């Protein structure tokens, strides 16, 4: 029953996740593509060298990188939804959830990464400064949670640079990593990431281990910290109020899945990347499972809790070996 419920959640939320969006690739329908076209599309961005340190810094066995995508109101605004009710869900992320999350991280003594759309930073500059003051990382997450695959190359470049400048000004730190909104990639996203000389990306899914990204068959020097939908809170707890089917997964079921993911990462001496959203994980019944998950991972020996930039630097050191 649990497996069936989890699968239904993914199917019902696919449109909201952007999984059925038409890509702005300029390519003909797949059945009309030549073999050369297929090979070019598939080979545009690929996984390269495994960059897993053996061991991780401090002699640790596994790295744990917890992240929060601080979307707040941006996804609603992106879609043209200006309903005060809809926007209030985003406000919850900053007003109610963020204090809980920061207190939880303080209590456990761990640092995390917060991927922030620039519009969120402009709406809540004091929240961003509080995050930085506690020693957490601020990473890029688009301007207003736009879908990169629906933008032209120049539009995407302009928004990415504007996002970088905004985050740097408000946070007082220089972002070195990006998580694209909705993990959406255009054919030129990696090209722009390289132009901006970012250290890492955390949007692709070719592995669970950190790896070097290949662009058009060539090494980029960009570290990928892979993500995966089963390691994201939104597919389990997100809700579209206008959908005829509204999924709800018991928090303990999700906790059980994430524990199993960590157990295998631990056995493989690999990397555990968790993606959450303050306005989702920060609710009372859900912050509890994050607390339990962290406590569970802390109970094991040789676990390194680190910010994404710290993990990426440890992985990047493998490029020189």
Predicted regions: what they are:
Residues 67, 139, 305-308:
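Generic enzyme active-site microenvironment
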Residues 8-18:
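Bacterial N-terminal signal peptides
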Residues 27-57, 165-169, 173-268:
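Active-site-adjacent pocket scaffolds in enzyme catalytic domains
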Residues 20-22:
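Boundary at the C-terminal end of the N-terminal hydrophobic targeting segment
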Residues 99-102, 106-186, 220, 226-243, ...:
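Metal-dependent polysaccharide deacetylase catalytic core of the NodB/CE4 family, i.e.
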Residues 31-137, 144, 256, 296:
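Active-site beta->alpha N-cap acidic-glycine motif
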Residues 107, 200, 212, 252-321:
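C-terminal domain-boundary segment and adjacent tail
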Residues 1-9:
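Bacterial N-terminal signal peptides that target proteins for export
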């Amino acid at each position: 029953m649990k497996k069936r419920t989890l699968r239904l959640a993914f199917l019902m939320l696919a449109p909201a996740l952007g999984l059925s969006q038409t890509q702005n690739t300029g390519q003909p329908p797949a059945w009309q593509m030549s073999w050369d076209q297929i090979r070019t599309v598939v080979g545009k961005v690929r996984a390269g060298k495994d960059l897993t340190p053996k061991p991780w810094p401090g002699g640790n066995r596994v790295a744990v990188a917890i992240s929060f995508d601080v979307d707040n109101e941006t996804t609603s605004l992106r879609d043209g939804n200006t309903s005060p009710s809809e926007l209030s869900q985003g406000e919850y992320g900053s007003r109610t959830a963020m204090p809980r999350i920061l207190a939880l991280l303080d209590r456990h003594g761990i640092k995390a990464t917060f991927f922030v759309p620039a519009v969120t930073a402009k709406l809540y500059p004091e929240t961003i400064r509080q995050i930085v003051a506690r020693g957490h990382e601020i990473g890029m997450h688009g301007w207003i949670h736009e879908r990169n695959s629906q933008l032209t190359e120049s539009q995407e470049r302009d928004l990415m640079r504007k996002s970088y400048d905004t985050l740097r000004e408000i946070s007082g730190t220089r972002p070195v990593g990006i998580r694209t909104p909705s993990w959406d990639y255009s054919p030129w996203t990696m090209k722009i990431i390289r132009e901006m000389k970012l250290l890492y990306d955390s949007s692709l899914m070719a592995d669970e281990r950190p790896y070097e990204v290949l662009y058009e068959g060539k090494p980029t020097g960009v570290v990928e910290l892979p993500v995966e939908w089963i390691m994201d809170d939104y597919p389990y707890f997100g809700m579209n109020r206008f959908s005829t089917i509204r999924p709800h997964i018991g928090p303990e079921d999700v906790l059980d899945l994430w524990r199993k993911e960590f157990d295998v990462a631990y056995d493989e001496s690999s990397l555990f990347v968790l993606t959450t959203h303050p306005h989702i994980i920060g609710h009372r019944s859900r912050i509890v499972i994050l607390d339990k998950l962290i406590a569970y991972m802390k109970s094991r020996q040789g676990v390194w809790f680190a910010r994404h930039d710290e993990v990426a630097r440890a992985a990047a050191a493998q490029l020189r070996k």
